[in-house]
């Protein structure tokens, strides 16, 4: 189920369980995961987009393997706040995922996270090819970190 309010999303989470975040792209998805205490977010992996079914199955496999209790999906909104074609694609992905899991799904504004992730990796001297292979998972961890920081208030 897609939850629009962060406090409601938090209320639906099972204590001491992990969350995942997804940075959805047309070619690959970055996946990040929290620890059980939800104090840190870590890049987990990158999934290559083959087709919609394969992507959904990969995400569901991660959910089952790590006993995930909630999903955060980065929502790409234009810098001016305008909904874009990619915004609609991500919303459709979230709706599709919601058909296969009862977990709460929260859409988090992800403006500039992939660029920030790429700059972060670059600052550590990571080569361009390696940055491009890992920036989506790092971006997902930044998206998740934003949510983790926000839910600490509740």
From Swiss-Prot:
Broadest EC class assigned to this enzyme: hydrolase
Gene Ontology MF terms: nuclease activity
Main location: cytoplasm
GO cellular component: cytosol
InterPro entries listed in its UniProt record: RNaseH-like_sf, YqgF, YqgF/RNaseH-like_dom, YqgF/RNaseH-like_dom_sf
EC number: 3.1.-.-
Keyword vocabulary terms for this entry: Cytoplasm, Hydrolase, Nuclease, Ribosome biogenesis
Subcellular location: Cytoplasm
Entry superkingdom: Bacteria
Keyword Hydrolase attached: yes
Physiological role: Could be a nuclease involved in processing of the 5'-end of pre-16S rRNA.
Stated family: Belongs to the YqgF nuclease family.
UniProt protein name: Putative pre-16S rRNA nuclease
Lineage: Bacteria, Pseudomonadati, Pseudomonadota, Alphaproteobacteria, Rickettsiales
